Design a protein with these regions (language model features):
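Active-site mouth loops of central-metabolism enzymes
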Residues: 1-27, 48-51, 75-79, 101-103, ...
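Catalytic beta/alpha-barrel core
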Residues: 38-40, 49, 70-81, 95-108, ...
Length: 259
């Protein structure tokens, strides 16, 4: 919801001419290889821009009205604000069948009940790279009355090389339990936010002046995004959230080649 502020230059170039959030969303939906659009309501963070819920809902409606593609709406990552915001998002988009990211242990009653029950959206259940926490959140969400088929897991993420082995091992255990043990509380699809992790690490942010041997800064960011997304998909993730058009196209080509 913050537009192109702070984005890499080639990302800005792709969205050139898009002056509103609706226009940006249309360009995102038209990106080569894109299967869905993710709207991140970062501006709602009370420790950041701190947009009001009403302001954010207006953005959500504008984006939803602009595209026909499947829509993921992610909160601001502040537990209290998301507990207020995401139920309103679910209400505003009733009938659209959007994925609401994410409920957590601290706010699952507010978000899960609104998104999964009152407004029949898809509930994103976010845990912190732990199979037991992931399963427990799925269990308590279904105990609210949410259909298990309306739950998608976000089991946590990391950039490749940054404790990433914990993500892989957790996905491996989840998929193993879901398949070999027929654990129906771990059989939900997994979505992994990749770009929020990869574009913040030093390999993507260090300038060419500081690290000339690493090559062009933006290419490194794309490489980190592609490598991490490919590893997530190989480990068991069913969908990944990406930022750079080249990364989206590369991962789409990889999926098609392996299909």
């Amino acid at each position: 919801d913050l537009g192109m502020e702070g984005e890499p230059e080639s990302v800005k170039a792709y969205y050139e001419g898009a002056a509103t959030m609706g226009e940006i969303a249309k360009k995102a939906a038209a990106m080569e290889g894109a299967d869905f659009v993710a709207l991140i309501l970062e501006g709602g963070d009370p420790n950041g821009v701190n947009k009001s819920v009403d302001e954010l809902i207006a953005v959500v409606k504008e984006v939803a009205d602009a595209i026909d593609a499947p829509l993921v709406v992610e909160g601001c990552k502040n537990v209290e604000k998301d507990a207020e915001l995401l139920p309103k998002v679910a209400e505003a988009l009733q009938g659209r069948n959007v994925l609401i990211l994410s409920e957590k242990e601290e706010n699952y009653k507010a978000i899960g009940a609104a998104a999964g029950l009152a407004y029949d959206q898809i509930v994103g259940a976010e845990s912190a790279v732990d199979i037991n926490l992931a399963k427990q959140l799925n269990v308590v969400t279904t105990q609210l009355g949410v259909n298990a088929q309306k739950i998608v897991m976000n089991i946590g993420s990391a950039a490749a090389g940054y404790g990433y082995e914990y993500v892989v091992s957790t996905m491996d255990r989840i998929k193993g339990a879901a398949l070999s043990q027929n654990d129906n509380m771990l059989q939900m699809p997994i979505i992994t936010p990749v770009s929020s992790e990869t574009w913040g690490v030093k390999e993507a942010t260090a300038s060419e002046a500081d690290m000339p041997e690493w090559g062009p800064e933006e290419e490194r960011g794309i490489d980190m995004e592609v490598m991490t997304a490919a590893a997530d998909l190989a480990a068991g993730s069913d969908a990944v959230i990406l930022r750079h058009p080249e990364a989206v196209a590369a991962i789409s080509r990889m999926i098609k080649a392996l299909a």
